[in-house]
């Protein structure tokens, strides 16, 4: 909600902290700051999330293993010196009691022992695919509608492949005062990714869809954020349902990030 750092750069920053603020032999962060940053400065209490009851340092929580940089919805950079590791996660967890605790507990119970033992998994063991949307492909069916936030959406089948083209016209926001149209590819029995430019900003979306009886259903994962939502369209109505409502208003335009230039 205001600061965007992609997963790669989050990992690099975590590595800098793991290396005590030194990068390629050069000290970038003061030694005293590093020392104070990762020790408890504030006492905290939490009955439902034990990790968050261990105290707070400088911009970081204390933890039973190392210490985490903690973002909303279960986004973490875990700095774990005991196994010389940085673990970066961009989850989409709810903010309910115990939900984020369960994520960390899974890391402590399963990933840390593997790292400590020097376990080297095979690629097929570490790659998992998010299930696609179930349904049918129909090359003769299109659908259009207006979402609750005023977005105008048109979904049309590709003529040369089993997929859809989605045109999503977003109403303007305070940061993007004019309407913007996103051209989004929708995969059938697969995920297709789209990099959409919005002025000097951008948004990255992975999408899968299918016809379920008379309803076109698509899942849109805004992969540059921890947010996913479901789109359902019939000629009479269009609905969108976020798994977890974003902190920023503005729908998809509220999730754009500065175009990264390396």
Label every model-predicted segment.
Residues 2-6, 69, 96, 100:
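Aromatic-acidic/polar surface patches that form glycan- and anion
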Residues 2-22, 75-92:
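Active-site-proximal alpha-helical segments within enzyme catalytic domains
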Residues 8-12, 32, 106:
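Extracytoplasmic/secreted proteins, especially bacterial periplasmic and envelope-associated proteins
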Residues 21-30:
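Structural helix-adjacent loops and short alpha-helical linkers that scaffold large soluble proteins
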Residues 72-131:
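Structured C-terminal helix/loop/strand segments within mature extracytoplasmic catalytic/sensor domains
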Residues 121-262:
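Peripheral terminal and inter-domain segments
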């Amino acid at each position: 909600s205001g600061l965007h750092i992609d997963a790669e750069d989050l990992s690099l920053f975590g590595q800098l902290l793991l290396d005590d603020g030194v990068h390629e032999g050069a000290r970038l962060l003061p030694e005293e700051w590093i020392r104070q940053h990762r020790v408890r400065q504030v006492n905290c209490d939490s009955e439902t999330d034990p990790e968050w009851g261990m105290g707070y340092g400088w911009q970081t929580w204390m933890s039973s293993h190392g210490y985490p940089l903690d973002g909303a919805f279960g986004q973490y950079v875990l700095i774990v010196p005991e196994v010389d590791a940085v673990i970066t996660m961009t989850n989409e967890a709810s903010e309910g009691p115990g939900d984020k605790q369960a994520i960390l507990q899974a890391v402590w119970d399963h990933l840390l022992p593997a790292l400590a033992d020097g376990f080297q998994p095979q690629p097929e063991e570490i790659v998992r695919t998010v299930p696609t949307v179930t349904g049918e492909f129909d090359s003769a069916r299109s659908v259009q509608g207006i979402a609750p936030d005023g977005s105008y959406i048109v979904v049309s089948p590709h003529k040369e492949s089993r997929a859809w083209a989605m045109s999503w016209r977003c109403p303007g926001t305070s940061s993007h005062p004019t309407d913007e149209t996103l051209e989004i590819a929708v995969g059938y029995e697969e995920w297709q990714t789209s990099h959409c430019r919005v002025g000097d900003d951008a948004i990255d979306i992975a999408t899968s869809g299918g016809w379920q009886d008379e309803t076109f259903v698509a899942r849109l994962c805004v992969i540059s954020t921890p947010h996913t939502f479901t789109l359902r369209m019939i000629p009479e109505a269009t609905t969108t349902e976020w798994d977890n409502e974003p902190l920023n208003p503005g729908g998809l335009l509220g999730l754009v990030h500065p175009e990264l230039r390396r």
